[in-house]
């Protein structure tokens, strides 16, 4: 979202970026935007105490608390700004923001930060409920979803489709979002046409205006070509760049990079299975394991995720072939010549960063659209392997050996080809470049109509 905001500023649009107090305090480079005279930050309370971890498994608590705490402040910002707001670009999950925009008469564009294929899975839920197919039993997860040409099984739908109760608050939130999305004047996606053309065509049945402007991290660099570099990072975690020195000493394409993103949380058993699999694979590995990424039975200063007893074989295997850091400069790591694959949680940003870097993937999804993304990586785009619903050291080791060894050339060739299309899309004349120009003109038209 922050990269999209910077691109809008570059195009001469006046931007107010609204964030939570908690996230804004942790942005490392927010002062960078002072170079844009028409860019400003506003912050909202999220209603949670400072010590709340705000991890992906607690997203419903965050959304509910934020709606209650921030809606009045948001309404005030939207209705009383000077100059007045003439367009709201909102993340799709904040349906209450869309309601406020409608109340004050501000045109709405949705920017869904999940993948279009993931959003399409989300939008299928009301129909599955209406047809009586939802909820699913565990025995039915391998049944093919109708209308997907055999690509999607029920287990490949967004994670909330595993919930057994139609009245669960998460299911009701998804239904509410699905009902709100067609009310927007357009949908903005962080993707490119060559990657998801069939899905984007389907989206036109929901919204008359579709803007595929990604991959945003590469698109922003294209727009800034010849100018100052973009914001160093929009991550809320401090990057440990010592891993780059370690990578510099490794052979070409010999390292698999491992990260489960900024929100996912694994159990200690899962930690050990992944770790054993990496060591047993015989491959070199760089693992970015952020603080708080491992759940503990009794959280507290005396029981944190660093309190992990490391067996001798893991310690020796890591010392010989591995490097562990708290958080890595991911774009730089994926672009490094020593890296030859990515074991990822399949978050959409990470997936796109891997696509642009031409890195094959091993997908171990956790939440939301990640189940869909991992299926598309293996079954549709042929860019790697899908490890969903499995966390076994033998499977991990086998998949690492495939991606880094026996099928290395196959995956690398396909990934390199897709990377070329991604980069073409964000350069002048490319599909994403043209879609963004169209977005700017449409936003300016909204401004004219609102006067």
Label the predicted regions.
Residues 1-451:
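Glycosyltransferase specificity loop/lid
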């Amino acid at each position: 979202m922050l990269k999209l905001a910077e691109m809008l500023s570059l195009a001469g649009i006046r931007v107010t970026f609204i964030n939570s107090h908690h996230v804004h305090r942790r942005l490392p480079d927010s002062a960078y935007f002072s170079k844009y005279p028409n860019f400003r930050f506003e912050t909202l309370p999220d209603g949670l105490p400072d010590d709340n971890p705000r991890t992906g498994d607690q997203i419903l608590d965050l959304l509910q608390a934020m709606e209650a705490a921030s809606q009045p402040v948001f309404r005030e910002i939207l209705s009383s700004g000077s100059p007045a707001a003439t367009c709201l670009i909102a993340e799709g999950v904040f349906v209450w923001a869309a309601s406020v925009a409608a109340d004050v008469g501000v045109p709405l564009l949705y920017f869904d930060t999940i993948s279009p294929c993931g959003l399409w899975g989300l939008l299928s839920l009301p129909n599955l409920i209406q047809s009586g197919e939802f909820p699913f039993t565990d025995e039915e997860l391998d049944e093919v979803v109708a209308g997907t040409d055999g690509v999607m099984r029920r287990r490949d739908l967004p994670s909330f489709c595993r919930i057994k109760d139609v009245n669960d608050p998460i299911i009701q939130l998804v239904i509410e979002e699905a009902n709100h999305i067609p009310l927007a004047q357009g949908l903005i996606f962080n993707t490119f046409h060559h990657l998801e053309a069939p899905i984007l065509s389907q989206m036109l049945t929901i919204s008359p205006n579709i803007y595929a402007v990604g991959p945003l991290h590469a698109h922003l660099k294209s727009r800034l070509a010849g100018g100052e570099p973009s914001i160093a990072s929009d991550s809320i975690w401090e990057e440990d760049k010592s891993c780059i020195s370690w990578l510099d000493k490794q052979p070409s394409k010999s390292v698999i990079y491992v990260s489960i993103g900024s929100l996912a949380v694994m159990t200690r058993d899962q930690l050990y299975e992944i770790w054993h699999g990496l060591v047993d694979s015989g491959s070199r590995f760089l693992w970015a394991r952020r603080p708080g990424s491992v759940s503990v039975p009794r959280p507290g200063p005396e029981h944190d995720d660093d309190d992990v007893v490391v067996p001798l074989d893991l310690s020796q295997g890591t010392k010989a072939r591995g490097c562990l850091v708290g958080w890595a400069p991911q774009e730089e790591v994926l672009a490094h010549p020593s890296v030859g694959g990515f074991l990822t949680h399949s978050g959409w940003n990470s997936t796109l960063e891997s696509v642009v870097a031409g890195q094959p993937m091993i997908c171990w999804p956790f939440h939301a659209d990640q189940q869909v993304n991992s299926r598309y990586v293996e079954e549709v785009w042929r860019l790697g392997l899908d490890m969903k619903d499995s966390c076994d050291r033998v499977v991990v080791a086998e998949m690492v050996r495939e991606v880094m060894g026996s099928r290395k050339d196959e995956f690398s060739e396909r990934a390199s080809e897709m990377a070329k299309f991604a980069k073409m899309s964000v350069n002048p004349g490319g599909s994403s470049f043209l879609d963004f120009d169209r977005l700017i003109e449409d936003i300016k038209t909204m401004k004219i109509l609102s006067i």
